[in-house]
A protein has these predicted regions:
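N-terminal secretory signal peptides that target proteins for export/translocation
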Residues: 1-4
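N-terminal intrinsically disordered, low-complexity tails enriched in polar/charged
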Residues: 6-7, 28
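Bacterial N-terminal signal peptides
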Residues: 8-18
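Sec/Tat signal peptide C-region and signal peptidase I cleavage site
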Residues: 21-26
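Accessory terminal and edge-of-domain segments that mediate assembly/interaction
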Residues: 27-351
Length: 351
């Protein structure tokens, strides 16, 4: 009894510290309103040849920086609560975002995400320089594959879903196969972002005009760039060609049950969606606050009369229009979220 009475004041003090410390730390947590996520940058963040990040850093005045362990580049931010991060490409993107979101200095539970980058655009749906708000993300990596040249003559391509016998049948996904194969973004939030930006004037260039004139057999591919609703087909391989585009179209229809259209192809969105959904189950982020905006820097398949090989290695004609579109279309959404933060912190926007 004597020992208990002697140590009881110390125990009480320790208990008070233990309860007070989380509250004190909570007051110091970093709470971004919006995180703009680019996947790569060329050289420096400012003042040189631009990648996906540079226009955001320069135009949103992301002049402050913070080093986060596990990230290749510092996080940039401004006083308005807009943060910018470069995730890296391919599977590295998901790993770096996990590192960011698990950093104990951040509270990202109310943060909105704008995944914002260039992509290969499907000429059946849009032209270079166009911007597509994704409703769905499709994983194009997990598959059986043989060289198409070795495939049976009646196969459209040499890729099929795990558990399948051929690519034409609807697959019965085995229990052991990784899941999910697609992610659906918050449809109300996507509709709001699209309604806010659908009439944004996009940059066109003489080079892009000349290039898309080759796509005269594609009405949407030969039109000036515009803002659309179109989904994100992601795989770590940089593929190109009409056969591969058909595969992307078919898999998008398959894994969205006919609701999706493969508008933009990229190498990161499936990894990012996978990471963010897992982080959401941990209470670190809110997946209902995630937006994906992809802009066409190049076509995903050649025009009539050109080989896929020649088209693949041709110089991008839509790079600068795509980088410009990423900011022109994304910025109004970021600004609206920040301006009405008193409302949007508690509830997501509606059209």
């Amino acid at each position: 009894m004597m020992n208990c009475r002697v140590f009881s004041p110390l125990l009480v003090a320790l208990a008070l510290v233990a309860f007070a410390t989380p509250r004190a730390r909570a007051a110091d947590l970093i709470r971004p309103k919006v995180i703009v996520l680019a996947t790569f940058e060329v050289g420096a963040d400012t003042g040189d040849k631009p990648g996906e990040f540079q226009y955001w850093v320069e135009r949103e005045k992301l002049t402050q920086s913070l080093t986060v362990p596990g990230l290749d580049r510092p996080v940039r931010f401004n006083d308005q609560g807009v943060y910018g991060v470069v995730s890296g490409t391919t599977v590295r993107a998901g790993a770096q975002i996990m590192a960011l979101c698990l950093d104990p200095r951040f509270d990202l539970s109310k943060t909105y995400w704008l995944i914002n980058g260039i992509a290969g655009v499907n000429p059946h749906l849009a032209s270079e320089g166009s911007a597509a708000w994704a409703r769905h993300v499709i994983d194009g990596d997990i598959a059986y594959e043989i060289d198409t040249r070795e495939a049976p003559a009646d196969w459209p391509y040499g890729i099929m879903a795990l558990g399948n016998k051929n690519p034409k049948d609807k697959p019965v996904i085995p229990d052991w196969a990784p899941k999910p194969m697609s992610w659906t973004l918050n449809p109300t939030l996507v509709a709001w972002a699209f309604a806010l930006t659908k009439n944004v004037a996009l940059l066109d260039s003489p080079e892009a005009q000349k290039h898309r004139a080759l796509y005269r057999d594609f009405p949407n591919g030969s039109r000036p760039p515009y803002v659309l609703l179109g989904d994100s087909f992601a795989s770590c391989r940089y593929w190109h060609g009409a056969v591969m585009q058909k595969w992307a179209d078919d898999w998008t229809a398959l894994y969205t049950k006919g609701a999706g259209t493969a508008a933009m192809t990229n190498m990161e969105d499936h990894g990012l969606a996978n990471a963010l959904t897992r982080l959401a189950t941990m209470g670190r982020v809110d997946f209902q606050r995630v937006l994906i905006l992809r802009t066409g820097s190049n076509f995903s398949m050649p025009p009539t009369g050109q080989s896929a090989a020649a088209s693949l290695v041709a110089e991008y004609q839509g790079m600068i229009p795509a980088l410009e579109a990423a900011h022109r279309v994304g910025a109004p959404v970021v600004h609206a979220l920040v301006k009405d933060w008193a409302k949007f912190e508690a509830q997501t926007p509606r059209p």
